Amino acid sequence: VGGTLFLYFNLIYLEDTEMDQTKTFYITTPIYYPSASLHIGHAYSTVATDAIARYHRQRGVETFFLTGSDEHGQKIERKAKEAGVTPQEYVDKIVAGFKDLWKLLDISYDGFIRTTDEQHIKAVQKMFKKLYDQGDIYKSKYTGHYCTPCESFWLDRQIEEAGGVCPDCGGPVELVEEESYFFRLSKYADRLIQHIKDNPTFIQPNSRTNEMLQNFLLPGLEDLCVSRTSFTWGIPVDFDGNHVVYVWLDALSNYITALGWGSDDDSLYNKFWPADVHIVGKEIVRFHTIIWPIMLM
């Protein structure tokens, strides 16, 4: 976890004190989902990240600014089928539009990761196998509610509390039963709670810290589904060909695979990791401040 700070992107914090120019600075945007063209919210978080990156560069700090695209999943597979193209062709076209927009806005990113990059795919497979071998991933069966647009699974009580719809987007959910691999989030919940309490600036603003603790961590975490068998557009689990890696391990790990973690050249990883700031939108705070830190533990 290190010293990473998660900033909900309507708040920007800049230090006025003189910076140590011998240090490095690593800042990221979320990686964006190419199911459609980007909108003002994507631009907002990216411009905010760009401003912070430029601030550090201007003060002589060696800076790495990462952005990218999260390209796998059932929604992409369905969209590509509707468009009459392959999933790869579908994302290639939309990601080209991402880069055109960042060029138009003069975004000064240092790295652009695509989760279809071969380096990323191999690193994710390595991570999945490592977690499986150490007993943190196990195979079971999932029965419950699934929202395709949000790529989120929900318990019965969560759907009931939301009035029968997805608690995040308000859209319809479907009941699914599927063999899956699960990650033992519950094993690390107490450790993450203590880390958040020991590091009060870990998540900002503070209202988001309270939300994560009161709504998710303190009531207790369920183990996390990390593979799917109902679609094929994803990174294959290399020791079980019926499964593809689900979004959590695939997308969230981009912050280290983009720096070369799991590859033959991890020089950028050794130089810049851990990240100093992850800029995220409010709808993905839970994934970045609970799932991602636990993955790193």
Predicted regions and their residues:
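Residue-identity detector for glycine
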Residues: 2-3
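Short, Lys/Arg-enriched N-terminal segments with co-localized hydrophobic residues
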Residues: 6-18
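Feature captures the FAD/FMN-dependent oxidoreductase FAD-binding
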Residues: 119-135
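Cys/His-rich short segments
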Residues: 136-189
